[in-house]
Structures are given as C-alpha cells and as structure tokens.
Amino acid sequence: MTKYFTSDTHFAHPFVAALRGYAKTGFTSDNTIRQQANEAHMQVKDCVNWYRHDMDVTDHINETVGPNDELYILGDLCSGSAWSLHHALIHIKSLRCPRNNRHLILGNHDDVLYGKSKGFKELTEAFGEIGRIGMTDITDGETIMTVFLCHFQWREDFDLPAVDGMASNWAKPELRRYAIPQVGESMRLLHGHTHADTPHEFRNRNEINVGLEAWNMRPVSEAELVRMFQEN
C-alpha cells in the first residue's frame, strides 16, 4: 500500500480547465475565457473541453493509484456548484482506489468547509474520510515523517508578496483563518490552493504543494515527498 497526494482536481470547473489548456478551438486557454465566452454569446462550459480535462485527471489518478493504495485529495474537488459536484462524484466513484481509501481535505471551493450541509451526504458516499485539516505519516520504506494536510499554505505565507503564476485568490484574507499556523520549524505541510507550477513556490521548504499543476497533473507518492523533505 502506498499513499498518494493531490489537490485542486476541479472536476466540472470549465474556467480552471481552460487555464489548464483545454479551451476549444477558436478560444484561448487563459483567464480571459469568460470574456471570450461573453463575446461569443456562449457559456464558458461550451467553450472548454472540460469533460476531456476531467477524463484526463481521472485517467492519471487511475494510472498511478491502485486498489490497495490510499488517495488524499487536498481540496477543491470541483467548482462548488451542485452541477459540478454531481460530475465530480461520478469521476471519484470510478477510481480504482476504493471509498475507504479516499480522503478529502476541504478547500475554498468545497462548500462544506464553511459549515454548509449541501452536498455533504454525497461526499460521504464517495470518501471514507473528510475534514478541514488532517495529519498522517508518510514513508519511503525507511524514514517515517508526520505531515499536516491542508488545502491552504501556511498561514504566515498569506503575508508574503505575490508570486507569479499563482491563482489570484492565493492570499485572499478571508481564507487565512482556514490555514494552519506554523508553530514549529519541524512541522511539515502538504497543501494545494495556489495552482503554482512548482512544489516549492514559497521560501519555506517545510511545505510542499501537491496541486496538479506542480506535478504534471498527477498524484505524487509519499516516497517522493519524503525525498523532497529530506533534500530541504
């Protein structure tokens, strides 16, 4: 059994799919996709191959995570709408990794984070564990490390200057309260949220971004994470 980690799957979230290169022919894959759709008198979801994006994300997970492995998704499963959640759960339930081996940490697009009950029952049918934050051990077979799990970067990172290539809401003040404060230098954190294309977008090397953009749109194994923490 191996633990795998990812974040920001954004199933059935056409805007994010566009940013990831899935705009249809005739449209540009960037953050102007809403404006492009408006000018074409279309909905964003009709301008983007979001279903191809979702199939690719699902296929990449199934190519990596087996039926005896554990999968941790650190938030932003979908856009947050009922339509998006419905499609997301279809993909989650198609994973080779069984329900009891799936863990969900809630992100800012997951309404349950804010105490809302909408969709919670459906989430419990697809995941064996759901929480705002978590903690688990990771190992490479020799070294064992304890890591915190949160959708968001360290709370202190919210005060840092903006970094190119990150989501516009990466340091949104109202999200700060959901982030974990780093109370000790030995604390290690796995997170997502920023959509950065590198696992180390912040100076603090005791946190690793497991978001899809940082890992070529695939989950990352616990052994690889242990190696990275040891290098830093």
Label every PLM stretch briefly.
Residues 2, 11, 15-138:
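Core catalytic region of metal-dependent phosphoesterases/phosphodiesterases
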Residues 6-7, 71-76, 102-108, 149-150, ...:
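Active-site neighborhood of phospho(di)ester-bond hydrolases with catalytic His/Asp-centered motifs
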Residues 10-17, 78-82, 108-116, 155-158, ...:
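Active-site environment of divalent metal-dependent phosphoester hydrolases
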Residues 125-232:
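Conserved beta-sheet core of the metallophosphoesterase superfamily
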